Design a protein with these regions (language model features):
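S-adenosyl-L-methionine-dependent methyltransferase catalytic core, i.e., the SAM/SAH-binding region
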Residues: 1-310
Length: 310
């Protein structure tokens, strides 16, 4: 298999899901179906629900998972809506959930999707090609202040003001239509020292724009707010993140559900209504092994957090 399509932290996810042959499991970010294939292969009378916002991913994974027959159900949808999707399917509770966040390797590798700053393509970056907002809209239509905000908040780009200003000046001459046109604009805004750094100068900006186009951070928050409620007691939640913004949301979401009642100790009765619903299986995130990194360098920034329903 192409290294770009190797499922990240596969062994660790399967081990921590504690898969039961008769259980119900959710892969909320189906992608190429690598994680799902391993889950479905461990089911006898159980069911796997695979969700992805990318119709191309649904089609490809569907072919890969076809041998499992009706043990697998695939849904075109956003992982942020996992709880609602399960309700729609008439599924009250599940035994495990897996979410592999961020852009998938096939999306990066398919030049025309516009995710990569290494190849020329139309400015798109939509994970769901049926959605309206594209990178072209963000780059060419959003106000300078909003561009500066997303570059700083989502890309943690220290040159956000300079890059936002350069984008606005460039698009005033003519629309920025392709990925490499945008890369040129970003390069023009950065000082020489930044251009000599090991990291590609457009990496942070492309991340920021992609997150904005796909509303990725809000999606993670909504998932963490609602999806764990669909776990049975003892069911496991596995979330793989690839940058600190996602990981912070996941970590905070688990911690909030671990603490339970927030009322003062002296309060005679609980009035906040919060109860503990999760416990962390490991306090620190699980990281890829050196062996995995040798086979799949794209796994380098991956972090897996695991929690159990209580």
């Amino acid at each position: 298999m192409d290294a770009g399509h190797i499922p990240v932290l596969l062994h660790e996810c399967i081990e921590n899901l504690n898969i039961r042959p008769d259980g119900i499991y959710v892969d909320g970010t189906l992608g190429m179906g690598g994680h799902s294939e391993q889950i479905a292969g461990r089911l006898t009378t159980g069911t796997l629900i695979g969700i992805d916002r990318d119709e191309t991913a649904i089609a490809r994974a569907g072919a890969r998972l076809a041998p499992f027959g009706d043990r697998v159900q695939l849904v075109h949808g956003n992982f942020r809506d996992t709880a609602a999707i399960l309700d729609r399917l008439g599924i009250g509770a599940v035994d495990g959930m897996l979410f592999d966040l961020g852009v998938s390797s096939p999306q990066l590798d398919e030049t025309q999707r516009g995710f990569s700053y290494m190849h020329d393509a139309p400015l798109d970056m939509r994970m769901d090609a049926t959605s309206g907002l594209s990178a072209w809209n963000v780059v060419n239509e959003w106000p300078e202040g909003e561009l500066k905000r997303i570059l700083y908040e989502y890309g943690e780009e220290r040159y956000a003001p300079r890059i936002a200003g350069a984008i606005v000046r460039a698009r005033a001459q003519q629309p920025i239509a392709t990925t490499l046109e945008l890369v040129d604009v970003i390069r023009s805004a950065m000082p020489g020292a930044a251009l000599r750094e090991k990291q590609h100068p457009a990496k942070r900006s492309f991340q920021a724009i992609r997150i904005a186009v796909n509303d990725e951070l809000a999606a993670v928050r909504e998932m963490m707010d609602t999806a764990p409620d669909k776990l049975r007691v003892g069911g496991r939640l596995c979330v793989i993140s690839f940058h600190s913004l996602e990981d912070r949301i996941v970590k905070t979401g688990i911690a909030r559900r671990e603490h339970g009642c927030t009322c003062p100790r002296e309060a005679p009765v609980c009035t906040c209504g919060f109860v503990q619903t999760l416990r962390s299986v490991s306090r620190k995130p699980i990281l890829p092994s050196e062996e995995e990194l040798e086979c799949n360098p794209r796994a380098r920034s991956a972090k897996l957090r695991v929690a159990e329903r209580v």
